Each structure stands twice: as structure tokens, then as C-alpha cells.
């Protein structure tokens, strides 16, 4: 297929008005125990004990089942490698599509209106970034795994061989149900690498240079029957041999022809599905894993193809680097906004290790590097499946090692496996106060907020795999979290659903949705005070102005609100992180608000209907 490379279309308008909710499917909700994964479905079942079983959803996370401890080697010097190497990655909890269907009302009640799914395609790992194919939803997320596996056994890259499995159909049912409730749906596209069980790689490994797929992967050396010493070796993503990398074309400007056509066919299948001869509702866009590791030409053509299929589709590239040029050159709608949002938030609001003025400078300079049309649709996340959870970042805020050059410490050794001093405890009241500040800032800043599943329910956890614990639910009673992977004593923690934190998330989300200025209005920071760790942020619309005041310090502070563009009348406190109705006092050139330590409040006021100077973007 020859693709045109047109100028990228503007990002869809809907993407500026959503609050994303990220779901890690295997850990969200087990709605159908009859389809639970089996030992044979695991990545390397021969190395998993016969007494393997589904892990109880509500158990103590660091407590290990008998099949896990059976793998421990006698005389191991410590217990940390045993927990992380022997068992936890082979755990399955049974999260599935039926579970998501059952909890759409929960998400609707929370107020989020867009769902981003981590990979849901057929794969053997728990995370599913090691796809076995991309044309099918994982059979163990649907109602008939055995039947689905039989149906797809002889498929190849030709779409004419592809069926619609029961899991595929259930996913499309979920998409339609989500659309009826006002959600947009984004799925993870892993087009950089596959798993070793991927149909093309299995054929390549078996047939070597005689394989039809010999040009699909980066092969370093072939196994030759005439040379018993020869070995089949290939490039794995970041050295992981479980994730063989798709090859580029000869001049490294594009994806190789074979995998490229396959990716295009998969893209069309899920954006514009036709089932039993009838069009069905498809997804609303893609999040692209490791997007900055593929040539720009491929993404430019792929993004143009996506828009030709669905003009209002949203595409979001994963990158942790400065991303403005990447988004513009490759044609994406946006990116996961680690560099321009999560990093500064970690530095000031969470760790309090950079001054307020630098926080403002980083946010302003990194935001303004993007096209103004891109900024409102950036995915403003703080944590994800690839980091420790927000709550645990806060618990461990004093551990962050900030280098002399002033760079921000983000996702570095944030787990027990690599940092023996990492604290796995439940957040306390002070930690939750900081979490509420972060959330209120996220919900009032420019860009689309992202909530990682369970953060709103009180979940905490270190870096992968500890950030991927089973979701806590109101109707489930969790065991006390009483085990420490280091084999030391621990005070039991209550992991059950946090209704108070949920209520705060819900109110902050509702406030954002109720005020259009928060989705597209300009941003102006007011009076950052480095010694007090205070600042304010002004968002201006045609009829109202909203100011967020933040005291990140450990003392009560009066925060002065003044700007040539602040023209409101009769401002009121709309929402605060401590639930108090703080008062605003007028002075000669603005307003004062007195905030306790670790508190933020949103002030809202109407403005005169007069010609106005809108100020900076």
C-alpha cells in the first residue's frame, strides 16, 4: 500500500475535553472467572511449578503462594530477588473485558470520560507488550479462550485469514457500551516489537532464512544445520530477548515492508471494524508504545492513514524526552506528557526539591515549545504502569537523589528491588494532602489529565510490578498488607477502598468538566515564592476567571493574587484540598488568601463583559 504524507490534521476537539482513565486490564476487574488464564497460557510454562494457580485478588501483595516459594533456590543471600524473580511475573489475577463492562458505571460516577487501555491483544505476559498477534484481543479476556485459540490457530498476516473471535466481539461490545455512556476509547499499539510467540517470529525461528518472514526482524546471526555451533540471535527491545524488534527498511527511514503492511491492516481493523459484513463501532485512537524508537517517515504515513480512516481519531506517542518536535514531525495528535508535566510536578509539588520559580519556568518553557493547538490535548499524567504510583512517589519524596545539574529525579530506583530504603507503607494524612494538591493542579492545568487506575481509590505501590496490583473495589475486602519482600517486620496496612479520596477526585474532575476555560484557556502563574513554596495559577475565559492557589510549604501562608489580567468580581472558593471554605480578602492591588500548610484552593469569579487584554498563552 502506498501512503500519502499530508500535513497533520489538527487534534480532535474532543481530546481537549476529556479526563483519561488508564486501565491495566489484567489487574482491573475479574468479571468472568470461567475464562481465567491457565498455566499453559503463561510465557514459559515449563518453568512454572505444576501447583500454579490464579492468585487471589484480595491477598497480601508481597505474600507468596506455595508455587512461588517452590522456585526459591536454597541458600539465596536475600529474599528480594526471590520475590521479584520467582513468581510475581507469572501471577495472574484474571482481569478481563467483562470486568471493565461491569465497571463502566463506576468510571462514569468518577467523572472520567475517556479510557486508555494498556495492551489487550493476544500475548503471554501479564503486561501484553509481547504480542502473539495484533489482530485479536487476548482470548483469556473473552468468554471462550479455548474456542478462540482454535479459531485463530492457522492465521497469518493476510487479513483474509482473520476471524472475529468471541473476545474480539466482546471488546467491540465494550467499545459500543462505552460510547453510549460518553467515553472515548484509546488502545495501546505496540508496533516496535513483538513477543517470541508472535506468528511471524515463530515461523522465522523454525525456518530461519527460509522463512517468509526473514525480513521482519533484526536478525544478528542464523542457526545453520551445517554448523552445530551456530546460533540464532536477534535484536530484542533494550536487550530483552523476549521482545524481538521489528526491522526497518534498508535505509532505516521506515518500517520494513512486511511488518508495515501488517500494522496498517491491524490499524484499520480496530478503527473501522467490519464484522459479519456489517460496520461496527471502532476505537477512537491509539497510544503508541516506544514511539520515538521508530523512523519518523513511518509515523508520518501511519498518522495520515489513521486520519484517512477516521478524521477525528487521536494518536498519542509515548516518549519521556522533549517531545514538541517529535509530535510535530511525526504527525501525532499529542504525546504522553512526562517531560513537560510529570517531571516538573515531581520536582516541586511532590518532592519540593526545586523552587517554585523553577517549577513555573519549566512548565511555561516546556509547554510553549509545543504548537498551541497541541497543548490542550497532551496527556498530562503523573504516574503510570511504568512508574511507581503517585502515592508512593509522595511517601518516598525524601529519597529522591537530585543531581548537581538540577535535573529532576523521576522514576529512578523507585522500588525495593533496586533501592533497599524504598518505603512500601501506606500513605499517611500528610502524604494524602500532597496527593490532593497534585490532583487539583492536574485538573486545573492546561492539557488532558490522566488518572492511573486505582489512584483515586487509595492505591499505592513501587515501580513495576508493584504499581500493577489488583484494583481495590468497594465490594471486596482486602487482606492486611503485612508482608515485606525484604523479610523484615512491617506494620499491617489497610488497602481497602478509600471513599474520602475517591470523593475528592470526583469533585475535582467534576469541577474541571464544568468549566471550559480549564480545557483551553491561557495559563498565567502569579507570584511564585521560593522561600515560602507558594504560587498561584490564573486561567481566564470569556466570562469567568479561575485561580488555583498552592501552599506546598510546611507553614501557614498568605498568598497574594494579583495580575493585570485578573478582572473578576466577587470571587469565591470553589474547591479546596482540605475541604475548608477559605476566605479571600481584597487589598489595594489584588486579593489575599490564607492557606494552611500543604493546601491548595481554587478561587472562581465572574468578569465584566468588556473588551479585555487576554495576556500570555
Regions found by a protein language model. Name each.
Residues 175-183, 192-193, 201-208, 266, ...:
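Active-site-proximal helices and loops of the catalytic beta/alpha 8
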Residues 23, 107, 117, 134, ...:
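Conserved, mostly hydrophobic/aromatic
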Residues 563-579:
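Solvent-exposed beta-hairpin/edge-strand motifs
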Residues 16, 32-54, 123-143, 191-236, ...:
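Aromatic- and acidic-residue-enriched segments that line the glycan-binding/catalytic groove
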Residues 19, 585-617:
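C-terminal beta-strand-rich structural cap/linker in extracellular carbohydrate-active enzymes
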Residues 15, 30-85, 360-568:
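Loop/helix patches that line or flank the sugar-binding groove of alpha-linked glycan CAZymes
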Residues 1-183, 261, 268, 598:
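N-terminal structural segment of carbohydrate-active enzymes
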